[in-house]
């Protein structure tokens, strides 16, 4: 027996857990390719559908976020109650279907309905991913896990800008681009079913060394708790400063990121006279560097915490840099008339912005793993309700003022809120767990 244990102790752990999170990164990227497809195709849709005012464009963008937001808490509960593998696969296949169906729409109403369907079906992915993180990654790996889980946003936005502008240019049709994006989504959803497993023990590719590494790390942090949660279970947590700051910070961050994601294509075209090709290239550069910055932030967070640094010092420093750089970059961009400087400043603003992704790991880090799906679902519900309202507000701002200046100031102000809320989170104080 001792010989066997000795052999196992020398065995190199497999990296199945990281392969799963790379697949989640791919799913997240496709998620955002499908989301951003509307913004990329909007000039063509506006011309074809006869849409002239920015407020209608804002309302069409918000259709996705309303349904996505309303499904966040139910999706978090699904992640806590059912198998994550099944939820991820079903959600991906269904949202791919809605993306493809969008190509058949000939009215604003029908297109809005497909965006609503897209929002409903995409909603379970992030809560399910947060649940996977709690069962597959040790606490010192969750910073990188969070960045991979949430890294699909900038990566998908960057790739979507290039891919969709190329498809539209090549085929001369935004409709064909939508169909190709939808079918590709369905294919990746099926791949996820064949590779992802709910726990490390279920995966045949996990060797004993990797299993021991995961289980030991999780047990040292207090273990995982299996508990089926109800909607009302979140209510006692809403009196805690950490939870309120978590929700508020994520809402402010979402205002900045999703505001830029939705409106930067139109901003570059209308305020700086970019053509579609130039806009696609600029979007690719900005959001690809945002993705790279996000991954760097994850590595810094994990290595810094592994060195024994206090959690408050690590996360407060990273989140402060993220918020301040984003806010200053957006403010300077709004006051610049140079197209080149606009792209440079927005790129600087976006580079550390996604360090906010550590928010996904906070419930687990603060000792609320059994409520991770429900808390992150609530957090995402609030932020996406914000994201649903923001396109409408910005659309009316642009329509009333005739420029993007007020909108950019709005995003810079939201960055200040993101900073304040992040500083209020006490990472050294666990959440007070509520018992039935």
Where are these regions (language model features)?
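Glycine-rich segments within core transmembrane alpha-helices of 12-TM secondary carriers
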Residues: 143-162, 168-169, 185, 290-294, ...
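Helix-loop-helix hairpin linking two adjacent transmembrane segments in secondary transporters
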Residues: 149-203
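Helix-breaking motifs and short loop linkers at transmembrane-helix boundaries and internal kinks
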Residues: 51, 83, 98, 104-110, ...
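Extracellular/periplasmic helix-loop-helix junction of adjacent transmembrane segments
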Residues: 39-70
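C-terminal transmembrane helical hairpin of 12-TM major facilitator-type secondary transporters
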Residues: 312-359
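Cytoplasmic helix-loop-helix junction between adjacent transmembrane helices
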Residues: 114-154
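Extracytoplasmic gate region of multi-pass secondary transporters
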Residues: 38-39, 235-297, 353-356, 360
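Conserved MFS/SLC helix-loop-helix module at the cytosolic interface between two early adjacent transmembrane helices
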Residues: 70-109
């Amino acid at each position: 027996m001792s010989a066997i244990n000795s052999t196992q102790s020398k065995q190199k752990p497999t990296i199945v857990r990281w392969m799963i999170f790379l697949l989640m990164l791919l799913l997240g990227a496709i998620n955002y390719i499908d989301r951003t497809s509307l913004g990329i195709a909007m000039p063509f849709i506006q011309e074809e559908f006869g849409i002239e005012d920015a407020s209608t464009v804002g309302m069409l963008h918000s259709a996705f976020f309303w349904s996505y937001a309303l499904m966040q808490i139910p999706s978090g509960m699904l992640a806590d109650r059912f198998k994550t593998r099944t939820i991820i696969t079903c959600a991906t296949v269904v949202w791919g279907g809605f993306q493809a169906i969008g190509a058949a729409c000939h009215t604003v109403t029908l297109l809005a309905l497909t965006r609503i369907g897209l929002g409903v079906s995409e909603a379970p992915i992030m809560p399910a991913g947060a649940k996977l993180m709690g069962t597959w990654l040790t606490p010192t790996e969750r910073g990188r896990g969070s960045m991979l889980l949430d890294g699909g946003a900038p990566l998908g936005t960057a790739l979507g800008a290039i891919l969709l502008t190329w498809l539209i240019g090549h085929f001369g049709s935004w409709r064909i681009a939508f169909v190709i994006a939808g079918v590709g989504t369905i294919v990746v959803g099926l791949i996820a079913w064949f590779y992802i497993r709910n726990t490390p023990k279920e995966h045949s590719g996990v060797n004993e060394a990797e299993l021991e590494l995961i289980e030991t790390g999780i047990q040292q942090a207090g273990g995982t708790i299996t508990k089926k949660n109800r909607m009302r279970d979140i209510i006692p947590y809403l009196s805690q400063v950490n939870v309120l700051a978590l929700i508020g910070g994520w809402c402010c961050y979402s205002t900045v990121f999703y505001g830029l994601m939705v409106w930067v294509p139109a901003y570059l075209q209308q305020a700086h006279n970019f053509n579609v090709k130039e806009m696609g290239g600029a979007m690719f550069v900005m959001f690809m560097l945002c993705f790279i910055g996000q991954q760097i932030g994850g590595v810094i967070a994990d290595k810094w915490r592994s060195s024994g640094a206090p959690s408050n010092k690590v996360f407060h420093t990273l989140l402060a840099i993220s918020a301040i750089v984003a806010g200053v970059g957006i403010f300077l961009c709004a006051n610049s008339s140079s197209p080149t400087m606009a792209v440079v400043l927005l790129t600087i603003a976006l580079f550390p912005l996604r360090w906010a992704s550590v928010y996904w790991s906070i419930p687990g880090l603060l000792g609320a793993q059994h409520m991770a799906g429900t808390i992150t679902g609530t957090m995402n519900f609030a932020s996406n309700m914000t994201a649903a309202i923001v396109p409408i507000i910005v659309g009316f701002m642009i329509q009333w003022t005739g420029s993007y200046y007020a909108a950019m100031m709005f995003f810079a102000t939201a960055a200040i809120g993101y900073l304040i809320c992040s500083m209020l989170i006490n990472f050294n104080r666990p959440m007070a767990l509520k018992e039935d």
